[in-house]
Amino acid sequence: MAKMRAVDAAMYVLEKEGITTAFGVPGAAINPFYSAMRKHGGIRHILARHVEGASHMAEGYTRATAGNIGVCLGTSGPAGTDMITALYSASADSIPILCITGQAPRARLHKEDFQAVDIEAIAKPVSKMAVTVREAALVPRVLQQAFHLMRSGRPGPVLVDLPFDVQVAEIEFDPDMYEPLPVYKPAASRMQIEKAVEMLIQAERPVIVAGGGVINADAAALLQQFAELTSVPVIPTLMGWGCIPDDHELMAGMVGLQTAHRYGNATLLASDMVFGIGNRFANRHTGSVEKYTEGRKIVHIDIEPTQIGRVLCPDLGIVSDAKAALTLLVEVAQEMQKAGRLPCRKEWVADCQQRKRTLLRKTHFDNVPVKPQRVYEEMNKAFGRDVCYVTTIGLSQIAAAQMLHVFKDRHWINCGQAGPLGWTIPAALGVCAADPKRNVVAISGDFDFQFLIEELAVGAQFNIPYIHVLVNNAYLGLIRQSQRAFDMDYCVQLAFENINSSEVNGYGVDHVKVAEGLGCKAIRVFKPEDIAPAFEQAKALMAQYRVPVVVEVILERVTNISMGSELDNVMEFEDIADNAADAPTETCFMHYE
């Protein structure tokens, strides 16, 4: 059997597991791993400017394409702790990423050695496995188990910590004998699925709630097929958005307290059954459980056993991978269709479509400074059907979810449960690295943009082009809006007179100068009529220079975005739409190509 360093064996494992890209920042304690990566070849390395940035790039890489696993590399100590936010974000959204850290030699682990920290203990609560490998011969097997765990059951992240002496130790390993472990996914039984479909048939006004598990399982096509067979409207969650095109007749809108459509909430409240697949009934989707479940039967299908009953007690709970369940659901529905047992739901579908045509929010404003709604309207016009949006949190994200349109799975890339500021730039770079031909447009408010702004240099250095729409109100907008309940506007202002950039008109940071200083291109817009030309200019600059292009739109300082405490108590702070001119890019008024 061949003898080699443990890190050289690790390279063979990564190759056999399909890894071709890694994001990271080298350091003394991880240098042996980097030496093996250089020697082995086959892995493209993208150098981040911050290890947290690298870990969010790995998230974006995984989320972009089915089957991907993003890899993040860092040294000991602070590099590992910098990865914790991404591990939390990935764990919360069931996203597999592999974080590999260097560590002090084993003999120094408990002697307060330089940058020696118990990263295993720190990372365990936010990962499926976190382990410091103390025996060199175990390195390939620990990595094998890591890939098995990341892919099996509810997907999630893993951290593998490698002490310096473990990395360089010589072990016996035969690469030709290595095989990835079989992946385990729980699957619904035929009896369970037949019961679920029978309950669906009995309902008069059912809706399917499709969550991120449908996207993670690469089951969007099956979801749409099942909905079409049964004529049941679909309500995607924020993480499931794109599983059915926004302009599909059965797309009933999103539901919730913030990232929701008026017509979506109205349809849910009019329903008598919720058929949940791959969703977790998050509180910002449901509001109070009492209101959400009132008068409705609930079916819940999820890959994670402990999700069934965690938030609400369903009438039928099934533990299953979404793809396995939907495969059987389609099969059973087809059999019932042939037997003439599927009810006609034309009236219910027509009611949903009517709400979709009439319960709209106004987006067309000509105000100066610009209202954010107009920005999203212009984005709908400019970027077309194939656009892939990347965003994280804040009023910019909430308004985007209310007003943009998504037509394909994995074309709304959003960290859902964790919502860390700074996520958008590195995640967008990770998406582009996974699929360089994808039409990626990122959306940030000014605070999210500033958190990890240095990662724009990565896009410039490695020629990773995308468009970043920056909506700037010089405020922590979502926090300002939530502070209204406390009758304050406290510690949330980002505006100041910039002594070096009078042209920003008191909005503080000159994002154009910063972006250009990092090697990117940037455009600033003050008037609504200049937004569309700026987007066209951005496309041309991106094609010419192959770098990120920032389009900053200076907004009015204060805009309150629709949100509320219950599904039937969402406050509309702006005018609602009365006609097509008020909301010209809604799918009922505009054809998307």
UniProtKB/Swiss-Prot annotation:
Upregulation: By glyoxylate.
Pathway: Organic acid metabolism; glycolate degradation; 3-phospho-D-glycerate from glycolate: step 2/4
Biological process, per Gene Ontology: glycolate catabolic process; glyoxylate catabolic process; isoleucine biosynthetic process; L-valine biosynthetic process
Cofactor: Mg(2+); thiamine diphosphate
Quaternary structure (record): Homotetramer.
Reaction(s) the record says it catalyses: 2 glyoxylate + H(+) = 2-hydroxy-3-oxopropanoate + CO2
Record's cofactor remark: Binds 1 Mg(2+) ion per subunit. Binds 1 thiamine pyrophosphate per subunit.
Function: Catalyzes the condensation of two molecules of glyoxylate to give 2-hydroxy-3-oxopropanoate (also termed tartronate semialdehyde).
An example Gene Ontology molecular-function term: identical protein binding
Protein name (record): Glyoxylate carboligase
InterPro entries listed in its UniProt record: DHS-like_NAD/FAD-binding_dom (IPR029035), Gcl_TPP-bd (IPR047034), Glyox_carbo_lig (IPR006397), THDP-binding (IPR029061), Thiamin_PyroP_enz_cen_dom (IPR012000), Thiamin_PyroP_enz_TPP-bd_dom (IPR012001), TPP_enz (IPR045229), TPP_enzyme_TPP-bd (IPR011766)
Native species: Escherichia coli (strain K12)
Domain of life: Bacteria
Gene it is expressed from: gcl
Top-level enzyme category: lyase
Family statement drawn from the similarity comment of this UniProt entry: Belongs to the TPP enzyme family.
Record has Magnesium as a keyword: yes
